[in-house]
Amino acid sequence: LNKIGGSSAKTKFKKLRFLFDFALAFHYLCMSLKNYMCQKPDMKQYAKHDGSAVTKDIRPQIKLCRKEEFENLWPQINDIFDKARQYMRRNGNNVQWTNGYPQKQTVASDVADGCFYLICLNGRIVACFCIRPSPEPTYAKIYNGQWPDDEPYNVIHRLASDGSVGGIALLAIRFALDKGNLRVDTHELNSTMISILEKEGFIRCGTIYVADGTPRIAFQKQGTRH
């Protein structure tokens, strides 16, 4: 009986030891895979125009547009504005960004004031936007609502993308939020921007009127430096 009992105990011990060793090996395997994934470069396969694949860095970089480079970069910036207008028209927004807005002199003023930014990917400009500090003259009066506070704020304007990279608008908005309290306005027909702002937690505050007299929906969110 003792032999039988001892044999049974040894068998159980061997099974427990096997399970322990297996669990330990599985743990180390998971840790190795985790470390491998964390060390992997943030890369993705993109398709060239000819259909072949090329590996490129997928992390867009935000940089301030410098005065000395603006003239050379303007054709690329203006092309992005054109593509943004085309996107608006295709999606039923025929009233925003008309008459060639944003004009070159407007953007040149943004650049001169050090508040115009470029979003670049692999050396190519894919989007642009402006962040200006308060006060914004057209925000002095708000209708059918009110601003949640009277604290200093920033305003994001002239946000445009060439459409080649997803999530660019959100990237720009979060970049602006890192600088503090942020107010944004957009047309009621700009469903894409409205959706982005609402998903990001912006409060719909009321209606403001821009310089040409047309209405815009006003939004605000407190940034991380508020």
Residues of each region from the PLM?
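Conserved acyl-donor/pantetheine-binding loop and adjacent beta-alpha core of acyl/acetyltransferases
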Residues: C130-S164
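A short beta-loop-alpha structural element at the N-terminal edge
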Residues: I58-I80
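Conserved GNAT acetyl-CoA-binding A-motif
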Residues: D178-L189
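Conserved active-site alpha-helix within GNAT-family acetyltransferase domains
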Residues: E188-G206, T214
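Conserved beta-hairpin
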Residues: D113-F129
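A short helix-loop-beta-strand connector motif used in the catalytic cores of GNAT acetyltransferases and
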Residues: Q105-L118, P135-P137
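Conserved acetyl-CoA-binding loop-helix of GNAT-fold acetyltransferases
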Residues: S164-D178, S195-K199
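Conserved GNAT-fold acetyl-CoA-binding loop/helix
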Residues: R85-Q105
